[in-house]
Amino acid sequence: MVQISQIGAVLAVCSTLTVAAPTKGKARFNVPQVAVPMKAVHHPAVAYARALHKFGMKVPKAVSDAARGSVPTTPTKDDEQYVTQVTVGQGKLNLDLDTGSGDLWVFSTETPKDQSQGHNLYMPTSKSKRLDGYSWEITYGDMSSAGGDVFLDTVSIGNVTASSQAVESAKKVSDQFAKDKATDGLMGLSFSVLNTVQPKPQTTFFDTVLKQLEKPLFTCTLKHGQPGSYDFGYIDDSKHSGEIAYTNVDNSQGWWGFTAESYSIGGGSNSTHSFHGAQHRGTRGSSIDGIADTGTTLMLLSDDVVQEYYGKVQGAKNDQQQGGWVFPCDAKLPDFTLSISGYNAVVPGKFMNYQAVGSVCFGGLQSVGSSGGVPNIFGDVFLKSQFVVWDTEGPRIGFAPQA
């Protein structure tokens, strides 16, 4: 997740971190996600509000009210959250891997006990180096927040270790984070310009270990309703079918930005649209710029596209009380297809059913708003439908169907 103050920031990134180099330039590793039982399920408007605020967009009052007025509910025994185990210092933590932020921050022994209870904690030791005068502070879209100081310590995933990685130790977290027992922090995988450490930003784990890797890339194979995986330094061809379609990345803001030329809803010869003037069937005009973000749960697109999609869903409505588009849980949902450099990336309709709220279900596709200049967000609802390559050479991003 990206904090509000990151919008438009292009920072000078510190390049002084040292890296352990076993078999330099040959490393590759797989990072499977693990399933962690969820202790509480928040109203989906919380995820929606966080996504909007994350990228500096205005949060409609109905969305804000639904998010702030919601309370966690007890999940069923089958509800799980998928995280990645990372060794930070001497201990293993469950972290979210987030391509939309540049910070590695964790719960620690510095976090007050009433906020850290139930979490795995990072424990600085005599081998950890505190960066005197350095700090970090993040506020997210649902007004959750965290902040603290910074250490240099070893961080390991698979067979790769950064021996002097910036680890942001939480000295305070808001209730939203304290109550989320499934995760112990976040590992950012954006470009390092988004790192928030002051007075000098630090490099991400990926950038720190980049020269160790066989190839300067990572891939993700996120799954719908089950754990996925990340691979660093190589492409596992057994995880995708067909050729990988690449498109250029715009990283001027630090994100993995790319362009989609058109979309279609359902099937049929009359279902293709450009993103400009979406109300006109078959027109071809301006393309759409968006951000690929594993740290955003939903897919957020312009009002006209979202309205057209739900116009094909019987009983769907933009519900002010629920803070977004909802529909009967047994409604038939059409597929949604994005055209990216000639490749058709299909999001199955069932992925658009994000979460039940009372007697209806909250949509995985929501509006990014109608004002110009706001980015479109291709979050997990989209990414779980694809095998994705995040390649720093270019830079570029690649898509293929999952095997």
Swiss-Prot record:
For this chain, one GO molecular function annotation is: aspartic-type endopeptidase activity
Q: Which residues are glycosylated?
A: 159, 270
Where in or outside the cell it occurs: the entry states: Secreted
tRNA processing as a keyword?
A: no
UniProt-listed PROSITE patterns: ASP_PROTEASE, PEPTIDASE_A1
The EC class name is hydrolase
Residues in domain Peptidase A1?
82-400
Removed propeptide positions: 21-67
Q: Which keywords label this protein?
A: Aspartyl protease, Disulfide bond, Glycoprotein, Hydrolase, Protease, Secreted, Signal, Virulence, Zymogen
Catalyzed reactions per annotation = Hydrolysis of proteins with broad specificity. Generally favors hydrophobic residues in P1 and P1', but also accepts Lys in P1, which leads to activation of trypsinogen. Does not clot milk
Catalytic site: 98, 293
InterPro entries cross-referenced by the UniProt entry: Aspartic_peptidase_A1, Aspartic_peptidase_AS, Aspergillopepsin-like_cat_dom, PEPTIDASE_A1, Peptidase_aspartic_dom_sf
The disulfides recorded in the entry are 329-361
Q: Does the keyword Transmembrane helix apply?
A: no
EC number of the protein:
3.4.23.18
Q: What biological process terms from GO does the record include?
A: proteolysis
Q: Name one GO cellular component term.
A: extracellular region
Check the UniProt entry and state the signal peptide residues, or none: 1-20
Q: Which family does it belong to?
A: Belongs to the peptidase A1 family.
Its annotated function is as follows: Secreted aspartic endopeptidase that allows assimilation of proteinaceous substrates. Can catalyze hydrolysis of the major structural proteins of basement membrane, elastin, collagen, and laminin. Thought to play a significant role in virulence.
The name this protein goes by in its record = Aspartic protease PEP1
What is the organism field in this record?
A: Arthroderma benhamiae (strain ATCC MYA-4681 / CBS 112371)
Species classification:
Eukaryota, Fungi, Dikarya, Ascomycota, Pezizomycotina
